[in-house]
């Protein structure tokens, strides 16, 4: 699934040729995504100018003077900017044709992404209004995280993947951040000290920033808008490396399942305070 770095890479990739352009038309080949695409967009969008392209969590927000397109890439989606004469292939579900001769093409084999339209204030949309702070902003800091940890028995990995706590820390980057912080993923969130919260906050920021610089992580379907894979996979320390040697101590990387998601860790470098503590 594309996570924050992949979505930010997409935003940066499409921005130069999409922002500031008038929409000529939208072609909806298959609107059966996670939520049905509003067929009235065929009438609503032509003539509108894309004023800005922003990201909130894993949502791309295309602003016009009449409303916003809210795009989510789902499990397997990607966006590419192509010449308008480029023929569509299987799973190319939506094209946004622009006045500069290019189009924004949405490709999604599993069709779990979404294209939504809203004319209400964007910050009040039901998908956005309850989200936590962006991890790369000053609002996400050690003091904030430590305060949120108090009284929470949830496993720390599950906790930092909660979008109401902080947005965009998906499975790959949660595993990597915890490894660099020396924190076992199953530890109760409330067990972290302020020092550990400080380390974890810093590593979440550095891991996400590094992933954005590398164009994200391509594990299966994700491609950047120019059709290239992300290269952060080459820098992964623990994610997807079960039974391979830890890059710090050569112990075997282990794997457990937390909240239906895989957690990868080195039990030597990431100590569990008490293996009898119940987690959820």
UniProtKB/Swiss-Prot annotation:
The active site is at 2 (schiff-base intermediate with dna), 3 (proton donor), 58 (proton donor), 261 (proton donor). It comes from the Bacteria. Its cofactor is Zn(2+). It holds the Pfam family zf-FPG_IleRS. The keyword Metal-binding applies. One of its GO terms (molecular function) is class I DNA-(apurinic or apyrimidinic site) endonuclease activity. The keyword Zinc applies. Its EC number is 3.2.2.23, 4.2.99.18. Belongs to the FPG family. A zinc finger (FPG-type) spans 237-271. Binds 1 zinc ion per subunit. This is Formamidopyrimidine-DNA glycosylase. DNA binds at residues 91, 110, 152. GO terms for biological process: base-excision repair. Keywords: DNA damage, DNA repair, DNA-binding, Glycosidase, Hydrolase, Lyase, Metal-binding, Multifunctional enzyme, Zinc, Zinc-finger. SMART domains: Fapy_DNA_glyco, H2TH. Involved in base excision repair of DNA damaged by oxidation or by mutagenic agents. Acts as a DNA glycosylase that recognizes and removes damaged bases. Has a preference for oxidized purines, such as 7,8-dihydro-8-oxoguanine (8-oxoG). Has AP (apurinic/apyrimidinic) lyase activity and introduces nicks in the DNA strand. Cleaves the DNA backbone by beta-delta elimination to generate a single-strand break at the site of the removed base with both 3'- and 5'-phosphates. It comes from Hydrogenovibrio crunogenus (strain DSM 25203 / XCL-2). InterPro entries: DNA_glyclase/AP_lyase_DNA-bd (IPR015886), Formamido-pyr_DNA_Glyclase (IPR020629), FPG_cat (IPR012319), MutM-like_N-ter (IPR035937), Ribosomal_uS13-like_H2TH (IPR010979), Znf_DNA_glyclase/AP_lyase (IPR000214), Znf_FPG/IleRS (IPR010663). Monomer. HAMAP family: Fapy_DNA_glycosyl. It catalyses: Hydrolysis of DNA containing ring-opened 7-methylguanine residues, releasing 2,6-diamino-4-hydroxy-5-(N-methyl)formamidopyrimidine; 2'-deoxyribonucleotide-(2'-deoxyribose 5'-phosphate)-2'-deoxyribonucleotide-DNA = a 3'-end 2'-deoxyribonucleotide-(2,3-dehydro-2,3-deoxyribose 5'-phosphate)-DNA + a 5'-end 5'-phospho-2'-deoxyribonucleoside-DNA + H(+).
């Amino acid at each position: 699934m594309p996570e924050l770095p992949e979505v930010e890479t997409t935003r940066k990739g499409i921005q130069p040729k999409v922002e500031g352009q008038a929409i000529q038309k939208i072609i909806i080949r298959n609107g059966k995504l996670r939520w049905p695409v509003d067929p009235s967009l065929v009438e609503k969008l032509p003539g509108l100018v894309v004023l800005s392209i922003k990201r909130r969590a894993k949502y791309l927000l295309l602003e016009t003077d009449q409303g916003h397109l809210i795009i989510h890439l789902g499990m397997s989606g990607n966006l590419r900017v192509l010449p308008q004469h480029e023929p569509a292939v299987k799973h190319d579900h939506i094209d946004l044709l622009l006045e500069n001769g290019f189009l924004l093409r949405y490709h999604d084999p599993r069709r779990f992404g979404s294209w939504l339209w809203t004319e209400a204030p964007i910050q009040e949309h039901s998908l956005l209004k309850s989200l936590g702070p962006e991890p790369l902003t000053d609002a996400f800091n050690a003091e904030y995280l430590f305060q949120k940890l108090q009284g929470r028995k949830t496993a720390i990995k599950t906790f930092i993947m909660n979008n109401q706590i902080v947005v965009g820390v998906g499975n790959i980057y949660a595993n990597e951040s915890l490894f660099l912080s020396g924190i076992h993923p199953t530890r109760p969130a409330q067990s972290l000290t302020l020092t550990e919260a400080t380390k974890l906050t810093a590593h979440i920021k550095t891991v996400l920033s590094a992933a954005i610089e590398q164009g994200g992580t391509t594990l299966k379907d994700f491609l950047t808008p120019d059709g290239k894979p992300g290269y952060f996979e080459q820098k992964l320390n623990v994610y997807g490396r079960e039974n391979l040697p830890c890059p710090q101590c050569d112990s075997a990387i282990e794997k457990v399942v937390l909240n239906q998601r895989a957690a990868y860790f080195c039990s030597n470098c990431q100590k569990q305070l008490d293996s009898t503590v119940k987690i959820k």
